[in-house]
Amino acid sequence: MCRFLLAASFIFSGFVKAVDPLGFQYKIQDYLTAFGMASWFPSFFPLLGGIVLSAVEFFIGISLFFATRRTLATSLALMLMIFMTPLTLYLAIFDPVSDCGCFGDAWVLTNWETFGKNIILLFAAIMAFRHRRMLIRFISVKMEWLVSLYTLFFVFTLSFYCLDRLPVLDFRPYKIGKNILLSLIHI
């Protein structure tokens, strides 16, 4: 159960960030500015970092779902949750960034909602890591490399396609084809 909860969360999070790499770039810039670190990194870093982080999240999610690369996937999930949980507590208390951006514009959570979500996911990551050898594989060990390679190819291709064109799924409130006047009325 913990494995599938983690997998769904990481797949969804990685996918929505990969679909809108520019949106995630802006969120990373918000974080760097809020923590006074914007000048520490070159201008391309938020975009490149966003694409890599979305790919890592998507890879972790697919790996957890199929139980491939079990040690790597559970270790990365646990490390991410150990880092993100205290960070979201800080965000919830001091509110330097309005929302976490963990699910892009697809599902906007408050900082306190994000902290609660991360507590649950941290527990799930601990359980998945502790029982990683007991995770039942959905594919053979010989096919692990193919699933891993395809996963990374898919998510990077998706990110660069959406960067070059428009997002294939647009979660923004003022997406193309939407009546802006009606959107403003419902706010």
Identify the residue ranges that each predicted region occupies.
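Functionalized membrane-embedded alpha-helices
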Residues: 1-18, 46-87, 122
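Solvent-exposed, well-ordered loop and adjacent helix/strand elements within mature globular domains
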Residues: 13-53
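Membrane-interfacial loop-to-transmembrane-helix junctions in polytopic alpha-helical membrane proteins
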Residues: 38-45, 49, 69-72, 106-113
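Membrane-interface helix-boundary motifs at transmembrane edges
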Residues: 66-73, 133-143
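Membrane-embedded alpha-helical segments of integral membrane proteins
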Residues: 82-135
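Internal/C-terminal transmembrane anchor helices
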Residues: 139-167
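Alpha-helical transmembrane signal-anchor/signal-peptide segments
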Residues: 164-183
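Conserved small/polar residues in nucleotide/adenosyl-binding loops
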Residues: 185-187
